[in-house]
Regions:
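Short, positively charged patches
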Residues: 1-137
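Short, well-ordered coil/turn elements that cap or connect secondary structure elements
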Residues: 72, 94, 141, 162-165
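Short active-site oxyanion
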Residues: 73-76, 142-146
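Generic beta-strand structural signal
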Residues: 97, 114-116, 142, 150, ...
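Phosphate/pyrophosphate-binding betaalpha-module
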Residues: 136, 145-167
């Protein structure tokens, strides 16, 4: 459970994108270890002062409280080391380190045949946002699982649309 709590909390730090998270995870091998690491330990393992400085924002986040917010919305998270993490995703060149889902993740991969990923810019136009949301909603209404990175912009709108469609 700890890994999930810290995986989610790290994603709440605005300057921590996938590349920085991959760098940290490669250095520490655990979300909890990243979260608990001191500034000097981060510097030693990554040789990246800017990244170590960005992680000072951890002080502003209460991991347990943030994880409870997810649970109250029925949202779960699985990490790359969990048995519930999709095996095929582990085989791609840069797999996501964690996935968010609504409902029971085991059911998603047994119940559905079709999956689509919607990704795009964080600085989307209003038209782009609306299109991503509508497309994801329509797909999920038609029993297509929409996978999104949950980043700001297109990814986030696709995620919202998929939730509206209630796959």
């Amino acid at each position: 459970m700890d890994e999930k709590i810290y995986a989610h909390s790290l994603k709440l730090i605005p300057q921590i994108g996938i590349l920085r998270l991959e760098k940290l995870y490669g250095a520490f091998g655990s979300f909890k270890k990243i979260w608990k690491a001191t500034h000097s330990k981060i510097m030693k393992k990554t040789q990246d002062k800017e990244l170590a400085d960005v992680l000072k924002q951890r002080e502003k986040i209460d991991p347990e409280k943030e994880f409870e917010k997810l649970k109250k919305q029925g949202i779960g998270i699985t990490t790359i080391k969990d048995s519930s993490f999709p095996a095929l995703l582990k085989e791609i060149s840069h797999p996501p380190l964690s996935l968010y889902y609504l409902g029971e993740i085991e059911n998603v991969f047994k119940k559905f045949e079709h999956f689509v990923t919607i990704v795009g810019t964080r600085k989307a136009t209003p038209y782009g946002r609306e299109t991503a949301k509508n497309l994801a909603r329509d797909l999920s209404t038609n029993k297509v699982v929409v996978v999104s990175g949950l980043a700001l912009g297109i990814d986030g709108e696709a995620h919202r649309g998929a939730l509206e469609g209630k796959t």
